[in-house]
Swiss-Prot record:
Organism: Dictyostelium discoideum
Cross-referenced Pfam families: IF-2B
PANTHER family reported in the protein's UniProt record: TRANSLATION INITIATION FACTOR EIF-2B SUBUNIT ALPHA
Main localization, broad class: cytoplasm
Name the UniProt record assigns to this protein: Translation initiation factor eIF2B subunit alpha
Entry keyword set: Cytoplasm, Initiation factor, Protein biosynthesis
GO CC, one annotated term: cytosol
Keyword Protein biosynthesis included in the entry's annotation: yes
GO MF annotations, alphabetized: guanyl-nucleotide exchange factor activity; translation initiation factor activity
Quaternary organization: Component of the translation initiation factor 2B (eIF2B) complex which is a heterodecamer of two sets of five different subunits: alpha, beta, gamma, delta and epsilon. Subunits alpha, beta and delta comprise a regulatory subcomplex and subunits epsilon and gamma comprise a catalytic subcomplex. Within the complex, the hexameric regulatory complex resides at the center, with the two heterodimeric catalytic subcomplexes bound on opposite sides.
Length: 321
């Protein structure tokens, strides 16, 4: 054991990173669930308690891996443990039967997660009408899938995408939409208030949906929601239910307690700027996430249904009880 981690599960991180590199378009939930199913299959434990301990050790390894730059991975792991091991000893007193059933439950969760984006796209389809203009921030595979689904259905709409600094992920979104022949325009992050009167609504993804119905997402999401509310524009969120998390941030500083979300090399252009005499002496704050309170969110599109922020706590109760 080193730093609280069980070295017997080093293979978990190696396999996870391999799957992430190979399957770039899948939800983070899929490789995570597959690996945890493998942990159950490979387990030599002869008791439920021992097997649960192995799963917990594997989860610790996953949560500590270098890839874990978001809180989504933690949410998936917690969802797996909750769903798969719920009331295990009571339901299956025979351990071999119990182990087989845990694998079966894991496969059910994997299949459910695989279909979640399709379900979200279908549920949100009626909100994309011909002629609408949608403002998108950052890169979200759920949001992208939703828009591509609507275009495939023959909907005619246009999209405005923010650059989404500091990683400029908006360029990736814009390129994918352009490749699908969806009219798209890229704008600076600071230009949202300039164009907000031209959009019909805002659509964003989420790294996490918290207990009060608010979201944690790409930095800049909160200020876009403020502008949207000031101009009376609907603010929609599209995300899978595995991103529901039992956390309750009260302000922006609480985000750092959820995840260390600062990037190590922010604003390289600034550091090399010729007008800065000593760029290395600049103090730069570079968070990647912010918290948007539920009062700024109109609806959330999930595979569980189209929810109001106030309905999120009810869904969490169903998931955790």
């Amino acid at each position: 054991m080193t730093g609280g981690l069980n070295k017997d599960f080093d293979w978990v991180v190696a396999k996870f990173e391999e799957m992430i590199k190979r399957e770039t378009e899948v939800s983070i939930a899929i490789p995570t669930i597959r690996i945890l199913i493998d942990v159950i299959r490979k387990s030599n434990s002869t008791t439920v308690v021992g097997l649960q301990k192995e799963l917990e050790d594997a989860v610790k390894q996953l949560k500590s891996c270098p890839y874990n730059q978001s809180i989504s991975l933690s949410s998936v792991c917690d969802s797996f443990i909750r769903f798969v091991t719920k009331r295990t000893e009571l339901d299956f007193p025979n351990f071999d039967t119990c182990k087989s059933n845990l694998v079966e439950r894991g496969e059910q969760l994997s299949n459910k997660s695989s279909m979640s984006r399709t379900k979200i796209s279908q549920l949100a389809d009626k909100f994309i009408r011909d002629g609408v203009t949608i403002l998108v921030h950052g890169f979200s595979r759920v949001v992208l899938g939703l828009l591509l689904h609507a275009a495939f259905q023959g909907k005619r709409f246009s999209v405005i995408v923010t650059e989404s600094r500091p990683d400029s992920s908006g360029y990736k979104t814009a390129a994918r939409l352009q490749a699908a022949n969806i009219p798209v325009k890229l704008i600076m992050d600071g230009g949202v208030s300039r164009i907000i009167d031209k959009v019909d609504y805002v659509l964003v993804g989420a790294e996490a949906i918290v207990e009060n119905g608010g979201i944690v997402n790409k930095i800049g999401t909160y200020q876009i929601s403020i502008v949207a509310k000031a101009f009376k524009k609907p603010f929609y969120v599209a995300a899978e239910s595995f991103k529901f998390t039992r956390s309750y941030p009260l302000n922006q500083s609480d985000i750092e307690n959820l995840k260390n979300d600062h990037i190590s090399e922010p604003f390289k252009a600034c550091r090399s700027c010729s007008s800065c005499e000593n760029p290395e002496q600049l103090t730069i704050d570079s968070p990647t996430l912010d918290y948007t309170p539920p009062s700024y969110i109109t609806l959330l599109f999930t595979e569980l249904g189209v929810l109001t922020p106030s309905a999120v706590s009810d869904e969490l109760i169903k998931l955790y009880c």
